[in-house]
Amino acid sequence: MSHDDPTVTDPTLYKVIFENERVRVLEYRDEPGDRTHPHQHPDSVMVTLSAFRRRITVDDRSAEVELHAGEARWIGAQAHTGQNIGDTATYSVFVELKEPRPAPVPAGDPPLGPSRS
């Protein structure tokens, strides 16, 4: 595990619930006001098990995200920090892909946090 792995940077927030040679599945839980340390995710699918609001920050850019329970979103590989800026706990599952991206990454700044595609 690398030093920027979320289970290393924030072991009280991230927990591995399944892993094999192709994917790793993380459970994430936090409370209002909680912040993560800088960490890295590979390409992933996030499934929200609770509604939440959070701020995602990458370098000098940040975005506020509000999601409902039961949503599934793609998250391209990125290093970031996150903060629960809402008034509810966050509960989500990340399915991290271990296989390399099949196509080149599009030019420009990648989206922050989860996207619909």
Which residues fall in each region the model found?
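Short, conserved beta-strand element in jelly-roll/cupin
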Residues: 40-55
